[in-house]
């Protein structure tokens, strides 16, 4: 079904924002209770997570400015999550605040959360619930003309694959 979002973090706030903007992304919303922003262009959602003491902050401290998580659209997130666990995936718990969606996630490479999202319709998406859109800002900016993400890689460090294959 595709990608819902890519989550980024940096140990130094202010590092990634100008890069997103140069690429044509606009900040369109802020999280209701966390130091997290939503950048968007076309149907591409980038989450910039600057929340202290979060999985994202620990990931950024270890890896530097980087992708610290990603979300995939699925028909039924709980069913997909349970199936992933049956196949050996490791669950990962993400702290949620009041009035915030609990997003099922499994542990990806380097501990990056891989979220499974089944709420992506206009008006009931995780952005409509967890974020506040900025006044006077287009919610779906055209930006530089990028429309969707069709693929990306989830790379491993050289020689780390031996630890994963047993």
Could you say what each language-model-derived stretch is?
Residues 114-161:
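Acyltransferase donor/substrate-recognition loop-hinge adjacent to the catalytic core
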């Amino acid at each position: 079904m595709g990608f819902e979002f890519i989550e980024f973090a940096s140990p130094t706030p202010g590092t990634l924002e100008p890069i997103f903007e140069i690429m044509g992304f606009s900040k369109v919303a802020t999280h209701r209770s966390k130091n997290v922003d939503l950048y968007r262009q076309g149907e591409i959602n980038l989450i910039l997570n600057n929340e202290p003491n979060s999985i994202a902050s620990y990931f950024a401290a270890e890896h530097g400015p980087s992708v610290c998580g990603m979300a995939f659209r699925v028909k039924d997130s709980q069913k997909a999550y349970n199936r992933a666990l049956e196949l050996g995936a490791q669950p990962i718990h993400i702290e949620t605040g009041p009035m915030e969606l609990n997003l099922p996630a499994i542990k990806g490479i380097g501990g990056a959360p891989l979220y499974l999202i089944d709420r992506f319709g206009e008006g009931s998406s995780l952005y409509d619930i967890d974020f506040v859109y900025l006044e006077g800002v287009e919610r779906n900016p055209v930006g530089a003309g990028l429309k969707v993400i069709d693929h990306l890689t989830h790379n491993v460090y050289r020689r780390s694959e031996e630890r994963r294959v047993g």
